[in-house]
UniProtKB/Swiss-Prot annotation:
<dbReference type="InterPro" id="IPR006140">
    <property type="entry name" value="D-isomer_DH_NAD-bd"/>
</dbReference>
<keyword id="KW-0963">Cytoplasm</keyword>
<keyword id="KW-0560">Oxidoreductase</keyword>
<dbReference type="GO" id="GO:0006083">
    <property type="term" value="P:acetate metabolic process"/>
</dbReference>
<feature type="binding site">
    <location>
        <position position="196"/>
    </location>
    <ligand>
        <name>NAD(+)</name>
    </ligand>
</feature>
<dbReference type="GO" id="GO:0005829">
    <property type="term" value="C:cytosol"/>
</dbReference>
<dbReference type="InterPro" id="IPR033689">
    <property type="entry name" value="FDH_NAD-dep"/>
</dbReference>
<dbReference type="InterPro" id="IPR036291">
    <property type="entry name" value="NAD(P)-bd_dom_sf"/>
</dbReference>
<dbReference type="InterPro" id="IPR029753">
    <property type="entry name" value="D-isomer_DH_CS"/>
</dbReference>
<dbReference type="GO" id="GO:0051287">
    <property type="term" value="F:NAD binding"/>
</dbReference>
<feature type="site" description="Important for catalytic activity">
    <location>
        <position position="312"/>
    </location>
</feature>
<feature type="binding site">
    <location>
        <position position="120"/>
    </location>
    <ligand>
        <name>substrate</name>
    </ligand>
</feature>
<feature type="site" description="Important for catalytic activity">
    <location>
        <position position="259"/>
    </location>
</feature>
<dbReference type="InterPro" id="IPR006139">
    <property type="entry name" value="D-isomer_2_OHA_DH_cat_dom"/>
</dbReference>
<feature type="binding site">
    <location>
        <begin position="231"/>
        <end position="235"/>
    </location>
    <ligand>
        <name>NAD(+)</name>
    </ligand>
</feature>
<feature type="binding site">
    <location>
        <begin position="175"/>
        <end position="176"/>
    </location>
    <ligand>
        <name>NAD(+)</name>
    </ligand>
</feature>
<feature type="binding site">
    <location>
        <position position="257"/>
    </location>
    <ligand>
        <name>NAD(+)</name>
    </ligand>
</feature>
Length: 365
């Protein structure tokens, strides 16, 4: 039987306090016993960076790898070339950009890459709306005042606004983007916009009150708030660079819970420090964990605040962890049993070809 390699983050005492932290090395998605009962070996580690990492050493003869977007084991072409037995790569969560998908298609006759589609879309959508409110209402510096023993209403109120009557736009209107728009509807925004290659159904557009904009540059120029909810692929990497940010409405807010590499971190930091952006919030970084010197850890608006960044947590609530742990087990069961009856929406690449358009328009190579 085969070896399963699981790359997760360490939970330490927190994993003991909260058994629901399934996405930790201590709790192993709650499936160690089940995997071993199937006759397989499970190796779990958080050590994933560098040539001498446990990840690199154990990957060589692993048949299955499981990792998460929150502590991704990056499956580069170089690593895949060394993984002679690898047949299945599972993302416990959503987003498989940590895998070189073109290389996966050409390795070992085609490695199947699957993720637990839909497992944390509600979690992320809620986090997006929360972050928008934190930024627009200038909550973070106000809370810092209280913690620091200060009290200066004017200092925080001068950069505090209402979400009502603002224009909000999402880049990407898939499972997360649509849910963000639905949750924003009760706030009576002036307009809800979206940019995506695939439009919403007319009845959904009408129900939400959303409008599609054909040009990304046109959309961001109209928005008070822009939220990024698209996958990372070759066409979205570095999408929010100095040029695109310069087209955003002066004093607007940018929220990114998609992937860190979709924005050019230095350009976002500079736009925030100059005041062109009133605020930036997000939980995604590249690489992850974010280095201590990452500029978006510290960048602020000239008036203070404007930074609502956190570790990659939006999609890993306790509720989400239950869903993606169960979904991971279902994918493994499909593989171990030899049925290979995966849910179509969970497949990213399979049989040496792309199973979805979510990662860009590609041709089989």
């Amino acid at each position: 039987m085969g070896k399963v390699l699981m790359v997760l983050y360490d939970g330490g005492s927190h994993a003991k306090d909260q058994p629901g932290l399934l996405g930790t090395t201590e709790n192993e998605l709650g499936i160690r016993k089940w995997i071993e009962e199937q006759g397989h070996t499970l190796v779990t580690t958080s050590d994933k960076d560098g040539e001498n990492s446990t990840f690199d050493k154990e990957l060589v003869d692993a048949e299955v790898i499981i990792t998460t977007p929150f502590h991704p084991g990056y499956l580069t072409a170089e690593r895949l070339a060394k993984a002679k037995n690898l047949k299945l790569a599972v993302t416990a969560g959503i987003g498989s950009d940590h895998v070189d998908l073109d290389a996966a298609n050409k390795t070992n006759g085609g490695i199947t890459v699957a993720e637990v589609t839909g497992s944390n879309v509600v979690s992320v959508a809620e986090h997006v709306v929360m972050t928008i409110l934190l930024l627009v209402r200038n909550f973070v510096p106000a809370h810092d005042q209280i913690r620091n023993g200060d009290w200066n209403v004017a200092a925080v109120a001068k950069n505090e606004f209402d979400l009502e009557n603002k224009v909000v736009g999402t880049v990407g209107v898939g499972r997360i983007g649509e849910r963000v728009l639905r949750r924003l509807k009760p706030f009576d925004c002036k307009e809800l916009l979206y940019y995506d290659y695939q439009p919403l159904r007319p009845e959904v557009e009408k129900e939400i009150g959303a409008r599609r904009v054909d040009s990304l540059e046109e959309m961001v120029s109209q928005c008070d708030v822009v939220t990024i909810n698209c996958p990372l692929h070759e066409k979205t990497r570095g999408l929010f660079n100095k040029e695109l940010i310069s087209k955003m409405k002066p004093g607007s807010w940018l929220v990114n819970t998609a992937r860190g590499a979709i924005v050019v971190k230095e350009d976002v930091a500079e736009a925030l420090k100059s005041g062109h952006l009133r605020g930036y919030g997000g939980d995604v970084w590249f690489p992850q964990p974010a280095p201590k010197e990452h500029p978006l850890r510290y960048a602020e608006h000239p008036w203070g605040g404007g930074n609502a960044t956190v570790p990659h947590m939006s999609g890993t609530s306790i509720d989400a962890q239950i869903r993606y742990a169960n979904g991971t087990k279902a994918i493994l069961d499909s593989y171990f049993s030899g049925r290979f009856d995966y849910q179509p929406q969970d497949l990213i690449v399979h049989g040496g070809d792309y199973a979805t358009k979510a990662y860009g328009q590609r041709e089989k190579k």
